[in-house]
Amino acid sequence: DLITNSYTRGKPRHVTSWPKLRALGNCVPVPGQCIGNGCFCDREAPHGNCCDTDGCTSLFWCPGSKAG
């Protein structure tokens, strides 16, 4: 699915349910990754932290704020 297929840069995948992602709201860091507005991104990705005012960067799908 979209979460388990997220780019993790070799780190173990951290699977979180969509209801929990929604409940977390804005940026909440977890080991190696970042959750914000329903998105799930790698903070260490080449294009930087996904947790900005728009949620994920344009290269990461973010159902909370950007169309996929």
Curated annotation (Swiss-Prot):
- Which Gene Ontology molecular function entries are recorded, alphabetically? toxin activity
What cellular component terms from Gene Ontology apply here? extracellular region
Q: Which UniProt keywords apply?
A: Disulfide bond, Neurotoxin, Secreted, Toxin
Residues folding into a coiled coil are none
UniProt key word Manganese: no
Q: Report the domain remarks.
A: The cysteine framework is XII (C-C-C-C-CC-C-C).
Compartments annotated for it: namely: Secreted
Organism from which the protein derives: Californiconus californicus
The membrane spanning regions, by residue number, are none
Prodomain positions: 1-21
Which protein is depicted?
Conotoxin Cal12.1p3
